[in-house]
Every structure is written in C-alpha cells, then in structure tokens.
Amino acid sequence: MTTRKSAEVITYPIFTVRWVSIHALAVPTIFFLGSITAMQFIQR
C-alpha cells in the first residue's frame, strides 16, 4: 500500500465540465460548417 500507481490516483472521468462545454460549442459549430459547405454545392 506504500506505492500507489499514478493511474489509480488520477482518474479521468468522461463527462466533465470541460468536456460538456467543449462539445456543446464544437458539435453544433462543425455541424453548421458542414451544412453551409454542403449548401454551396447545391444547384437550383
């Protein structure tokens, strides 16, 4: 018990405040950029 692994001490949860704030901004941004670039090639 004297030697602890660093993986057991530092745990990286998936859903953090940083993860939510990044994906709440990045996912709609990439979706709108992809949809806008797709609209450029639509011929009427």
From Swiss-Prot:
A cellular component term, taken from the record's GO annotations: photosystem II reaction center
Molecular-function annotations in GO: electron transfer activity; heme binding; iron ion binding
Membrane topology: Single-pass membrane protein
Pfam families with a match to the protein in the record: Cytochrom_B559 (PF00283)
Localisation per UniProt entry: Plastid, Chloroplast thylakoid membrane
Cofactor stoichiometry and binding remark: With its partner (PsbE) binds heme. PSII binds additional chlorophylls, carotenoids and specific lipids.
Residue runs in coiled coils: none
Binding site for heme: 23
Subunit and partners: Heterodimer of an alpha subunit and a beta subunit. PSII is composed of 1 copy each of membrane proteins PsbA, PsbB, PsbC, PsbD, PsbE, PsbF, PsbH, PsbI, PsbJ, PsbK, PsbL, PsbM, PsbT, PsbX, PsbY, PsbZ, Psb30/Ycf12, at least 3 peripheral proteins of the oxygen-evolving complex and a large number of cofactors. It forms dimeric complexes.
NCBIfam families tied to this protein: cyt_b559_beta
Protein name: Cytochrome b559 subunit beta
Name of the gene this protein is made from: psbF
